[in-house]
Amino acid sequence: MKYLLTLLMALSLVNLMLTRPTPEDDGGTSEEPQTQETTGETTGSDEKKGASEEPNADDASKTDDVEEKGDDDTAKKEDDGESKDGEGSEKSDKEKGEPKNDPRETYNKVIEQLDQIKVDNVEDGHERSELAADIQRYLRNPIVDVIGSAGDFSKIAKCFKSMVGDAKKAIEEDVKGFKECTAKKDSNAYQCSQDRSTVQDKIAKMSSKIASCVASNRS
């Protein structure tokens, strides 16, 4: 009986020793997680550090780009300002130092005045036709020819101040003479309309006077 008790105690002690973990197992188990955690922390720290450094480089690059763009914009504005100032000064010098040269404008303004001389209100067709031909031949054509080389209308404007009024007066006098002629016995409209010497002479003198004025003032 005593022998059996001793045997059971020995078996229990052996079993206890077998089930107890060894110091090597404890050390290996406890150190591996620590190493992994340390490695993970180190890797995470390096990644965060690298990530934090990369934006800094991009920010610096963006800052340089913004500064360069700002310098370019400033230089461009300065160049534009100088260009505009130069154009403005050149334009001002031209306006002050050079006479205006626009033959088309001169032509248009003279034609506007010539167009005011009308014979539409003349009742008789023969008289109206003859007057229109006289004005075209002795007034419009010579005036258009003489203003061909005139570029600045302001210099010759005074030559046309009385043209419209004088022409209308000449037309009225001719119409009056025509009516007096047709009122005579044995006269007719055609014959009376053929006496053109008086009105033609008046219109020709007007045209000659204007041409001389333009020639002496256009340059």
From Swiss-Prot:
Comp. bias (Basic and acidic residues): 72-107
Expression sites by tissue: Salivary gland (at protein level).
Signal peptide coordinates: 1-19
Taxonomy, superkingdom: Eukaryota
GO biological process: immune system process
GO cellular component: extracellular region
Principal cellular location given in the protein's record: secreted
Region (Disordered): 19-109
Biased composition (Low complexity): 30-43
Keywords, in A-Z order: Immunity, Secreted, Signal
Places the protein is found: Secreted
Pfam family, one: Aegyptin_C
Role of this protein: Induces expression of IL4 in host skin by diverting host CD4 cells away from Th1 and towards Th2 responsiveness. Induces expression of IL10 in host skin. Down-regulates expression of IL12B, IFN-gamma (IFNG) and TNF-alpha (TNF) in host skin.
Protein name: Salivary IL-4-inducing protein
